[in-house]
């Protein structure tokens, strides 16, 4: 099995809001590498086995994307939307997740190990068997897991400054 590596030029045409549109594409096994990945829309794209390797991902939208086995080797994700994204074995380990919205996502068996999670939402999520080992939840507002299914989720050696786990 040869590893497929895709290089994308982020100087492509932008939409009216200044976003590079990579929506509704099959980007399986692509490797996105660079300093900053910013203002990219991955709406409804297939991102299975994709690796993001960069210092920062900012202002990106992964709404309804398929993210099975995606690896985020990023120092920081900022203002990123994963609403209704679905995937297994997504790896966010050792990243700063700053203002990330995971609402209504299904991210089973995912890894949030040693993440710093700030001002982010996990409302109505299905996070079966995901791991938050040694994660820090730091927030001006409360971290929210309202109506989320946390069956078999591991919160081991976690620090939470303020949180909401209602219903």
Each predicted region: which residue ranges?
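Tandem repeat scaffolds
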Residues: 3-167
